[in-house]
Swiss-Prot record:
This is Peptidyl-tRNA hydrolase. GO terms for molecular function: peptidyl-tRNA hydrolase activity. It is an enzyme of class 3 (hydrolase). It catalyses: an N-acyl-L-alpha-aminoacyl-tRNA + H2O = an N-acyl-L-amino acid + a tRNA + H(+). GO terms for cellular component: cytosol. The gene is pth. The lineage of its organism: Archaea, Methanobacteriati, Methanobacteriota, Thermococci, Thermococcales. The keyword Magnesium does not apply. InterPro entries: Pep_tRNA_hydro_II_dom_sf, Pept_tRNA_hydro_arch, PTH2. Its EC number is 3.1.1.29.
């Protein structure tokens, strides 16, 4: 069975986070964006959930690139979540760490993130 819906989490490669910290930030993004989809694009959320919740993690160069991707995604009607760290461990409070996009139709999500490299 092919996937028709997916979620992409974009992590900043310039922060050099530990693996554990990165995993937590990606998880925050995935859950927060899924909740946004549940509230605003329920049919996309439900289809994605039924299909097994496909997720892909890719990297962006910096915060500026995350904002650009967020703008592109929102223009296409995709749910997004920009995650700011609480700053309790490795990085200063308020540091933007990841952008989660979707879940949404795979072909729409790919218009925004298809050119990015896997993490």
């Amino acid at each position: 069975m092919g996937f028709r819906y997916k979620q992409v989490i974009v992590a900043r490669s310039d922060l050099k986070l530990s693996k554990g910290k990165l995993a937590v930030q990606v998880a925050h993004g995935a859950v927060t964006a899924a909740f946004e989809a549940y509230k605003k694009k329920r049919e996309w959320f439900e289809a994605w959930f039924r299909e097994g919740q496909k997720k892909v993690v890719v990297k962006a160069q910096n915060e500026e690139e995350l904002f650009k991707l967020k703008s592109e995604a929102e223009k296409l009607g995709l749910p997004t979540a920009l995650i700011r760290d609480a700053g309790l461990t490795e990085i200063p409070p308020g540091t933007i760490t990841v952008l989660a996009i979707g879940p949404g139709p795979e072909e729409v999500v790919d218009k925004v993130t298809g050119h990015l490299k896997l993490l």
